[in-house]
């Protein structure tokens, strides 16, 4: 075998031009196998967290429940009894505080992510807590219409951007609650509408900053009837920021993260991207390449871009692995 010299030549008018090579593609079998390993990791991790910490947290239990619900809708053998038990415990945890005899709700985004984990088919234990969540969201909404997570992740000097991210997540949860207008009390529905209106006013004129998740959330909200209907622009920008290895970083120009890549896969598929979409294929290949043997992904804390550049622990890996798993599952057919 020998090397051919490289030639630069003009293409004659009408000449056939070879199509650009397709990105490497994973089979459904490979994706299901990776997702299966990841689900096993998430279940074991959240069970240990529940037993040891007796806490839901924003990162551990909600994303296990969310991933298991996505898996169940795609034909995975999910232990429904265990899932129902975990769901009931998590929603009860976020609605009560047995030691103090009062309702708490936990951290704000814990409640938000639990609502989103039930998208489309909430269980009875979730539905009965939804009216309380509405009052909780109303109580926590700031005067300017935004929400702010108690343990907020933000870049230095970027509080407004972080508030917008937290607010967009909450808007998605409000929209999920609004889908159940036939089962929720009228006062709850009125409260949701008022909170929704104030949040939209806060986000009016918001501009993208450094964070990729801001852009992903903006694209998803726009797709789901956002205040500024420009889904094509937001999605196009999100696609343009995909790294050469197929992933997305936490901030523009940063190295790829399984956490953010899973979020972006979720958004792309929710906005209609199909499994053969080049951006989807590249992201799937990135996640398959970076998955550990135990089914998890190594994920640095988002505080790594602020004050904790070396932080990587079981919480950050579980949270990122949850998103990576959800992203992979979204590329598989339902049924």
Q: Which role fits each region the language model picked out?
A:
Residues 10-335:
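Preference for long, amphipathic alpha-helical scaffolds in soluble/luminal domains
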Residues 1-10:
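Bacterial N-terminal signal peptides
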